[in-house]
Every structure is written in structure tokens, then in C-alpha cells.
């Protein structure tokens, strides 16, 4: 089990609502894991943390994300290309090779309104439904099989 919390870039919810776009000038956190809404400077909410978690889980399994090797003449152009890659990458393709619940988790996160309080119990149960499936990289045996 991994618990990773970074409150260094957290923003408070004001009266239960996400912050406004004018409250910040750039993407919060690493662009590689940031939600599409974060990169578009839209109001952030819990769903953005969950979308970032989904990208982190895919990265932990694969060791890279489809946009990990994106390059461009400027950082701004690179960030735009990464955002576009995320917007066009279907959860089923991004999560290919992972248990089906990962793609569904990402789909639900992306569809959630920014201000909505997630049903954490349901999301946890969704991911737990596939917890018994070993995560394997193509062509590699799991440590327990050696």
C-alpha cells in the first residue's frame, strides 16, 4: 500500500467550492500527472486530484505515460501538446494491460464536475474489485512466479 500526500501545492476549497481560474497563473504540480482542467487553468476540485492519481497509477505500472517523451521548441508548446495528448487519449487505451477498473476510474474522474464531492467509497471499491489481479508488464514474470 502506498500513501503519498503532497500538501505543498494544495489550495483550500472556499465554502465547499473550487477555486476560481483567476486565483492562479499556471498549472499546479507536475504537468505529466496534472488533470486536463488543471492545465487549462479551470477551477480545481477533488476530481482533479483523482485524475492525477489515475495518471500516477498508470505511470507506476508502465514506467512512463504516452506523453512522457513529448518535446517542443518551448515549454509552453510542450505543455499544450501534453494537454492535447491527455484530451485525446481514451481511458481504455491509456489503461490497456491494467485491470479494467483503472480505465473506468479515469473515465469517472474525467466526467465528474469540479465542485462535486466524489463518492470515495465507490471509487475505492471499484479499484479494489480488481485488486486480486496481478499487474504484469508484457513478457515479465511476477516476482511470486520466480
Language model feature labels by segment:
Residues 2-7, 34, 53, 57, ...:
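Structural signal for hydrophobic/aromatic residues that build the beta-strand cores
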Residues 54, 58-61, 106, 110, ...:
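Short, amphipathic alpha-helical segments that act as regulatory/interfacial helices
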Residues 97-108:
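Conserved C-terminal C-lobe helix
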Residues 19, 26, 30, 36-99:
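Conserved C-lobe activation region of Hanks-type protein kinase-like domains
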Residues 51, 143-145:
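Long, extramembranous regulatory segments enriched in acidic
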Residues 8-9, 13, 38, 118, ...:
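Residues that form ligand- and interface-recognition hot spots within folded domains
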